Amino acid sequence: MNKFKFFIVFLILSLVFLQNEYAFGSSLNEELSYYSVEYDNAKTFKESIKQKNIELTYKIPELHTAQIKTSKSKLNSLIKSNKNVKFVNPTCSTCVVEKSVKTGKNLNNKKNGSHDLFDRQWDMRKITNEGKSYKLSPDRKKAKVALVDSGVNSSHTDLKSINKIVNEVPKNGFRGSENDESGNKNFEEDKLNHGTLVAGQIGANGNLKGVNPGVEMNVYRVFGSKKSEMLWVSKGIIDAANDDNDVINVSLGNYLIKDNQNKKKLRDDEKVDYDALQKAINYAQKKGSIVVAAVGNDGINVKKVKEINKKRNLNSKTSKKVYDSPANLNNVMTVGSIDDNDYISEFSNYGNNFIDLMTIGGSYKLLDKYGKDAWLEKGYMQKQSVLSTSSNGRYIYQSGTSLAAPKVSGALALEIDKYQLKDQPETAIELFKKKGIEKEKYMDKKHYGNGKLDVYKLLKE
């Protein structure tokens, strides 16, 4: 009998051991994924993930939001055992969505004066009334413009007013796939040649002229050479606001999914990323900053469910909603693009109650019509694309809504200085809409918002 009892006990213990061994082994073999988490208490959250041996990969303390890397089993355990965790979803990433064309031409204008390049800046000549707005600029420029973007070439001869650079990209970059990303907070390299393009439209002051030449610019780098986490963008906005920037330019984004009918903690949408972005924008507004965002470059009506849902492979019957973010969020000045004839660019997103205003971002209509060779040889590129500063220290033609938004950001900084509207974002926006926008008869609300940017009109008293 005793032998039988001993055998039973031995068998039970063996089964328990085997179950634990199996569970441990499966945990080791489980795929690790990245998740965005919203929590209540920072200390409790930190202790919880430490206890469960979950890796913390990114955090935004101001928003009570973080990114973790873990297995599904550990994630489920964290959610079930921790009331401090509010919501969790797979982390959403973003990418720069400009249509990039290899022109084979980089302009190196060392031999030419600024007048020669300004002649080629048909877009800047239009919105400044042939440069007349420069003469109306305030003598002392105190306003600061932040760029949440891919970095910048601060040694470019036309971008001497770059003051501060904050690298938001963590060590090893996007999900550990970029070994050349050190995580150094001062690292500035613009590997995508995007932030440098944007900076030129705001404050270039040399051979090329931005809308607000010489304005102080601060750059919050949220891209390496690949994608960016949307949480990095939110962190960039938070840091820009904390640094007392008057305007924060965001010429990037993604189509974020949010299901307002879903009340579950573990989400299959992107609520945490969406909410973090909205909270970051609200935070910036309370700090006195104006967030300016470019619309997407897909030429779709964002208010048509079928069109925008297609961007994320969703059918129109789902309760999930897709948002062009951050352009479609609250407390954002949303900017679309027009071409050389002041008509909406073919790539610029639109929709009812979506756009605040338009300005020039260029077009590729003639490229699509005649092909690349004719586009380059017959001067169509110079006619329709926007000339800006390049990360290689030269200049390059490009088109996209990303080149429209910074014109508005630079103009807002001019207005803030001119009319002494520091830390008055709502007043500044209201005045801007009254003085800085011109509306042609054909400009309907759905495609053009309130109209097109006029910097000369904005500054003329």
Swiss-Prot record:
Its EC number is 3.4.21.-. Pfam families: Peptidase_S8, PPI. The keyword Transport does not apply. Keywords: Hydrolase, Plasmid, Protease, Serine protease, Signal, Zymogen. CDD domains: Peptidases_S8_Lantibiotic_specific_protease (cd07482). The keyword Protease applies. Pathway: Antibiotic biosynthesis; epidermin biosynthesis. One of its GO terms (molecular function) is serine-type endopeptidase activity. The active site is at D149 (charge relay system), H194 (charge relay system), S402 (charge relay system). Transmembrane segments: none annotated. Residues 121-459 form the Peptidase S8 domain. Residues 1-23 form the signal peptide. GO terms for biological process: proteolysis. Belongs to the peptidase S8 family. Protease which cleaves the matured lantibiotic from the modified prepeptide. PANTHER family: CEREVISIN-RELATED, PEPTIDASE S8. This is Epidermin leader peptide-processing serine protease EpiP. The gene is epiP.
